[in-house]
Amino acid sequence: VRSGPRHAGRGGPGPVGYAVLEYTFFEQGFLTLLTVAPCARRQGVATRLVTAVEAECATPKLFTSANVSNQPMQRLLLAAGWQPAGLVHGLDEGDPELFYLCPPEKRSRSSTLRTFPDTVIGKESRIRTPLGTL
């Protein structure tokens, strides 16, 4: 399993949000996890994390998904300009998964890491197993 950059939003004494970018979705970028502490929500942390992931992604396409029940994530993605890309039933019983695609024009801009110095980037890693490096 190959793990991509991790982004942490900082506020006050420590991290208040976390995002994980992986390249396991048809070898394209996929925002697999985005979470913000309840005390830091509605303060732009998630938007800054999504912007950092957009800037960091090294593949031509960047996707993410959210359950139909996850209205806050859907609003965030639509406000950030992401486009609906599909719907999958059966992953979570009774709660279909909506997939979103980051538009290419959002990905071609210069890195926003200088704009958001509170974003911390992790290193890409590989896992060694008895069967070889993944």
Locations of regions flagged by a protein language model:
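Conserved acetyl-CoA-binding loop-helix of GNAT-fold acetyltransferases
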Residues: V36, R42-A55, R75, A79
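Short, intrinsically disordered C-terminal tails of secreted or membrane-associated proteins
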Residues: R126-T133
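Conserved catalytic-core motifs of GNAT/GCN5-like acyltransferases
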Residues: F63-S65, G81-F99
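Conserved N-terminal glycine/acidic-rich loop preference
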Residues: Q28, Q71-H89
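Acidic, Ala/Val/Gly-enriched low-complexity intrinsically disordered segments
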Residues: D118-V120, E124
